[in-house]
Design a protein with these regions (language model features):
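Metal-dependent amide/peptide-bond hydrolase catalytic core
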Residues: 1-106
Length: 106
């Protein structure tokens, strides 16, 4: 229409990942004891480094999961105004420690 052309050169990429059901089941069971609750899972479309690790683990018959802890919305990520409610840190650490211990003793 305006004589414009474009060339696209792929210089990078990112993937997505999904937390394994076995991990979700354990988190759903353990979260209330840590004062937390599990929201319905969604595919992870962020943290491309974490999704690559997760895919690698899953491709080698391991279980992988990625948990986001609700900590308020005080400015966009990676900005000078970003902040979080630090009250979530202790329950989140408790959940991760409890999850790890539960995986050690299937």
């Amino acid at each position: 229409m305006h004589g414009v052309t474009v060339d696209i050169t792929r210089t990078g990429w990112a993937t997505s990942a999904t937390t394994d059901g076995a991990i979700l089941g354990r988190v759903d069971t353990l979260a209330p004891s840590c004062g937390l609750r599990l929201l319905p899972p969604r595919p992870l479309r962020a943290s491309d480094d974490a999704t690559l690790f997760m895919r690698h683990v899953q491709e080698h018959d391991g279980l992988a999961g990625y948990l986001l802890m609700g900590a308020g919305t005080y400015g966009p990520h990676h900005s000078p105004t970003f902040d979080l409610d630090e009250a979530v840190l202790t329950p989140a650490a408790d959940l991760l420690a409890t999850l790890i211990r539960s995986l050690e003793d299937p």
